[in-house]
Amino acid sequence: MAKKVEKLVKLQIPAGKATPAPPVGPALGQAGINIMGFTKEFNARTADQAGMIIPVVISVYEDKSFDFITKTPPAAVLLKKAAGVEKGSGEPNKTKVATVTRAQVQEIAETKMPDLNAANLESAMRMIEGTARSMGFTVTD
């Protein structure tokens, strides 16, 4: 019989830098997970993506064992990296802080495709463009 999932824990952790310190430690401690076991495994799996923030969904089972799924970095993080800025605009409709090209948007959409609820690349690109506009970025051809 399959193990029964007791709890789902969702976190966003910098790749290769999971530590038992907050926010990771307390979230996993409440779920009863072996914190060191998780941090070692997560850091090993994400070592090649250094510098990115990686969303992770941890399934905790009744016997306190766990497994986790890493997702692609958030679109906002990928857009900031592509545009070379630290953060988006505080007033996106008034102040534009950066410009991204359609080619960069397409590259980000291809990266995010497994995690997006999009039927094709074109609709995924529209989602990424919407995120860019809401951050105060201008999308150019």
Curated annotation (Swiss-Prot):
Pfam families: Ribosomal_L11 (PF00298), Ribosomal_L11_N (PF03946)
GO BP: translation
UniProt signal peptide: none
GO molecular function, one term: structural constituent of ribosome
Domain of life: Bacteria
Any one GO CC term of the record: cytosolic large ribosomal subunit
Post-translational modification: One or more lysine residues are methylated.
Keyword terms, alphabetized: Methylation, Ribonucleoprotein, Ribosomal protein, RNA-binding, rRNA-binding
NCBIfam families: L11_bact
HAMAP family: Ribosomal_uL11
The protein's assembly and partners: Part of the ribosomal stalk of the 50S ribosomal subunit. Interacts with L10 and the large rRNA to form the base of the stalk. L10 forms an elongated spine to which L12 dimers bind in a sequential fashion forming a multimeric L10(L12)X complex.
Role this protein plays: Forms part of the ribosomal stalk which helps the ribosome interact with GTP-bound translation factors.
PANTHER family according to UniProt: 60S RIBOSOMAL PROTEIN L12, LARGE RIBOSOMAL SUBUNIT PROTEIN UL11M
Family (UniProt): Belongs to the universal ribosomal protein uL11 family.
Name of the protein described by the UniProt record: Large ribosomal subunit protein uL11
